[in-house]
Regions:
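Non-catalytic accessory segments adjacent to catalytic cores
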Residues: 2-8, 77-215, 440-450
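Cofactor- and metal-binding active-site motifs of prokaryotic enzymes
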Residues: 26-63, 74, 113-161, 245, ...
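Cytosolic ligand/metal-binding cores
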Residues: 3-7, 74, 83, 145-164, ...
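A residue-level signal for conserved active-site and pocket-lining positions in enzyme catalytic cores
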Residues: 64, 108, 141, 201, ...
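An anion-binding catalytic pocket shared by soluble metabolic enzymes
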Residues: 50-67, 128-130, 134-140, 207-296, ...
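Conserved hydrophobic core element of enzyme catalytic domains
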Residues: 335-338, 342-450
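Short acidic (Asp/Glu) and glycine-rich catalytic loops that position anionic groups and cofactors
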Residues: 12-17, 202-205, 312-318, 331-334, ...
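Extreme N-terminus nucleophile/cap motif
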Residues: 1-76, 83, 202, 206, ...
Length: 450
């Protein structure tokens, strides 16, 4: 029999703890609990992996919905709505802070379009464009390699956890891979257009993306389990929230703010394939570390991130560490750096998020020109793609993972999406190849819904 111990959380509530058997993989268990506790009963949820812990937020006690023209707070079946104007950060932050007076953590996602306001491009958004969805869950379950801990969860949830552990996590089914080389969106032509605009001096860099349709309904939890075994993300996520499903393996942090006010962002720019054998991987790494195009792309991204950090950090505290090291992320390897600073006394986490969002590695340089070009040249609104999945805490903390290397489903359509950084030295064929490399993080591991 599995033993259950009970401790008291920092909020004063009891948090049952269940030891995790050695043979159980925590990622597999967390995804299966999402199925048992949320998928089967039609509840919204978000699973977020950070630092060796998988946090499953189940059910919606209250929801904050921010659109381009309206803020809604939904609680106990009652919707309070208001028009808003100005910057979205303070509007969302105030609604979030009110909920965090009553709970420890909130979870959600931020759309790419949240970031266009900083550059005065909001007039290009359609009415009711989704900007953010953040919720207060009914319960949280935290899975580590040692234990399962329940916060605010019902006795039924505890019994469900024990049931899954007793029955065992089922095996995942066979994947149905999709071909990543189709180019129905004329991606190469759009890259060529961007290179021309860069040569004309309109901007220095832009990230253009392409979507790849998945021709079957996706089993998101099973796909999460299988693909997680083949990826090394800085964060991973699985969610059904605000009308969208997503599963992904984030390669970098847009922003993290800890309870001491330390802000961190980790730009990755410069890419080569990985997983093609030791010799080819070493050759690709050597090329990545010596290729002038990749080095320039990374250096200007880090400079941009440092400038943004300086805006919201205490003077003299913004620094670059671990500069231009190779970081492996599933089917690709990147040049990566860490930029950090001490949050200024007059700023908060939403100021940090607005300054760093959208990620420089998913938008462009300068960001104003890059974002404007994306709104013209990319495939319609990005939504969750290149936005962020977020976890917020009552102590002022924020963890925002860049939403890349992911699959999405909305309104019966399922797709993948990937991009590449375009600079003047770019060639359409190489940038298309880079999108194929990034799509291969997930494309071989898609499992069809039964």
């Amino acid at each position: 029999m599995t033993e259950v111990s009970v401790e008291t959380s920092s909020a004063g509530s009891e948090s049952p703890s269940i030891p995790l058997p050695l043979h159980v993989d925590p990622a597999d268990l967390a995804a299966e609990l999402a199925v048992v506790l949320s998928e089967r009963v039609g509840e919204e949820y978000l699973l977020y992996e950070r630092g060796g812990a998988w946090v499953l937020a189940t059910g919606v006690r209250a929801m904050v919905e921010l659109d381009s023209d309206e803020l809604r707070v939904i609680r106990d079946g009652v919707t309070q709505s208001q028009r808003w104007s100005g910057r979205p950060g303070p509007v969302l932050g105030e609604a979030i802070d009110r909920l965090l007076l009553e709970t420890d953590q909130l979870f959600g996602w931020i759309a790419f379009e949240f970031g266009v306001y900083r550059y005065g491009l909001q007039q290009r958004l359609a009415p009711r464009t989704p900007l953010a969805r953040v919720f207060w869950p009914h319960g949280r379950i935290v899975v580590t390699r040692d234990e399962v801990r329940l916060f605010g969860a019902s006795a039924g949830h505890r019994d469900d956890v024990l049931g899954v552990l007793g029955d065992g996590v089922p095996d995942v089914r066979e994947a149905s891979a999709v071909d990543v080389v189709a180019d129905p969106s004329d991606y190469r032509d759009r890259v060529a257009s961007a290179v021309g605009e860069i040569a004309a001096g309109r901007y220095h860099k832009v990230i253009l993306s392409r979507s790849l349709e998945v021709p079957f309904a996706l089993d998101f939890p099973s796909t999460y389990r299988l693909a997680r075994r083949h990826n090394t993300p800085v964060r991973s996520f699985l969610l059904r929230l605000g009308g969208i499903r997503a599963v992904g393996y984030s390669p970098e942090l847009v922003a993290a703010v800890d309870n001491d006010g330390v802000v961190v962002t980790e730009p990755l720019a410069g890419t080569r394939a990985l997983g093609r054998g030791e010799v080819r991987d070493r050759q690709a790494r050597d090329d990545l570390e010596s290729n002038s195009k990749e080095i320039v792309e990374h250096a200007i991204s880090v400079r941009s991130s440092l400038q943004e950090m300086t805006e919201i950090a205490e003077p003299g505290t913004a620094v670059v560490t671990d500069f231009m090291t190779v970081r492996e992320r599933g089917s690709v390897q990147h040049l990566g750096s860490t930029v950090s600073g001490q949050l200024g006394t007059s700023n908060d986490r939403m100021d940090a998020l607005e300054a760093l969002f959208p990620a420089v590695t998913a938008s462009g340089i300068p960001k104003a020109g890059g974002v404007e070009a994306i709104m013209r040249l990319d495939e319609g609104p990005r939504g969750l793609y290149s936005g962020a999945v977020v976890m917020l805490s009552a102590d002022g903390g924020l963890d925002a993972a860049l939403t890349l290397r992911a699959a999405y489903e909305r309104d019966g359509k399922t797709w993948l999406r990937a991009g590449a950084g375009i600079i003047e030295e770019s060639t359409p064929d190489r940038e298309f190849e880079e999108t194929c490399e990034k799509l291969s993080t997930l494309a071989p591991y898609l499992i069809a819904r039964q």
